[in-house]
Amino acid sequence: QFKIGGKTINTKKVINAATDVAHAATLSDEDVAKMAKEYIQWMDTHNEVAGPDTEMGQRLERLTANVKKVSGLDLNFKVYNVVDVNAFACGDGSVRVCGGLMKIMDDDEVFAVIGHEIGHVVHSDSKDAMKNAYLTSAAKNAAGAVSGTVSKLTDSQLGDMAQALAGAQYSQKQEYEADEFGFQFCIDNGRDPYGMSNSLNKLLQLSESEAKSSKFMQMFS
């Protein structure tokens, strides 16, 4: 440590932040999967998970009973008992669906949304989003090198990443490709492929009656 302008600078943390930024640029699939596993554990802890004996838990199990692996990736599914109309998938194969989405969509629509989110993983979109979230955390680590400004990254890394991922946006091309994947995902599993367009239309209808800041549009933003 040394001082500039009366403030103590944590040189070790500055070096660690620089290392984090460099590392983020070369994250392997294994690195992302490990990070995703830690992230999903954090999310499962900070959100109420609907158990297998609940209506939503049983419904999700019925929907995904025959979908255990995609493109060599083992999948696991859970539903959060929250009002958000959202869903996401991570590089470790974890797929999470929010209760708010399940309440407004039928089975084919929910299945299509799940396929859409898995598409982001298969196309490495989720990996890129995780990299960007890691970079955001690394930037905060650098900012936190001045003692007393922000909490240490090691104390809030997962929270920072959760915040960054919640605000992540995919490109129009990435969304279109994920829609195509979701469409084919439905066909391959004997579901109505129009569940994809129906789910999108339902979101668009909701957007007309909800404030633009509402979280439900983040899923396809």
PLM segments and residue spans:
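A Zn2+-metalloprotease active-site environment signal
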Residues: 1-221
